[in-house]
Amino acid sequence: MATIEVEQVTPVAAENIEVPPPKAVESEEVTTVSESLPAPVTESQAPVEVTTKDLVVEETEKPIEETEEAQVETPEVVEIKKDEEAPVETPVVVEDESKTEEVVEAKKEEEVEEKKTEEAPVVVEEEKKPEAEEEKPAVEASVTAPVEKADE
């Protein structure tokens, strides 16, 4: 086995540890951070088109009306589709599942029948083998018996 040498380290007293003073944030760093943030847009800086109340109201009202009409029509169409499609799809899925189960069951039945047919000849062969073995000792016994008589 390999041996490991462990070196013990004694902790240094807390008085000897030098802690650097906290870093003072320079004004340059503060300005770069504030410049990287997006500045809020004031009314004096905003484009003229946005500040005009008439144009903004007309533009916002038209899209709202169009979206409201579209929203009203869309749910009705979706609801009708859901009602029509859901009952139609569900029986189809159930039928598919039952068909696959029937097919699987039919295959299992075929496999069982095949196993039965495979097992039957094996059993018959096993029965034949003992008969053949029984015949051989009888023949050997008849052969050995005359030999013994000849020796006497």
From Swiss-Prot:
Signals that turn on the gene: Levels follow a circadian cycle with higher levels during the night and lower levels in light phases. Accumulates in darkness within 24 hours, but repressed by light and the product of photosynthesis (e.g. sucrose) (at protein level). Induced by sucrose depletion, but activated by mannitol and sorbitol. Triggered by gibberellic acid (GA) and salt stresses (e.g. NaCl and KCl). Suppressed by a high concentration of calcium Ca(2+) and of other metal ions.
Keyword NADP belongs to the record: no
Name this protein carries in UniProt: Cytosolic calcium-binding protein 1
Expression across tissues: Predominantly expressed in petioles (at protein level). Mainly observed in shoots, flowers, siliques and roots, and, to a lower extent, in stems and leaves.
Keyword Cell membrane recorded: no
Described purpose of this protein according to its UniProt entry: Binds calcium Ca(2+) and may act as a signal mediator to buffer Ca(2+).
Sequence repeats, residue ranges: 57-62, 67-71, 78-82, 104-108, 112-116, 124-129, 131-136
Native source species: Arabidopsis thaliana
BP term (GO), one: response to light stimulus
Localization, UniProt: Cytoplasm, Cytosol
Disulphide bridges, residue numbers: none
Protein keywords: Abscisic acid signaling pathway, Calcium, Cytoplasm, Repeat
Comp. bias (Basic and acidic residues): 96-138
GO CC term, one of those recorded: nucleus
Gene name for this UniProt entry: CCaP1
Region (Disordered): 60-152
GO molecular function: calcium ion binding
Region annotation 7 X 5 AA approximate repeats of V-E-E-K-K: where it falls in the sequence: 57-136
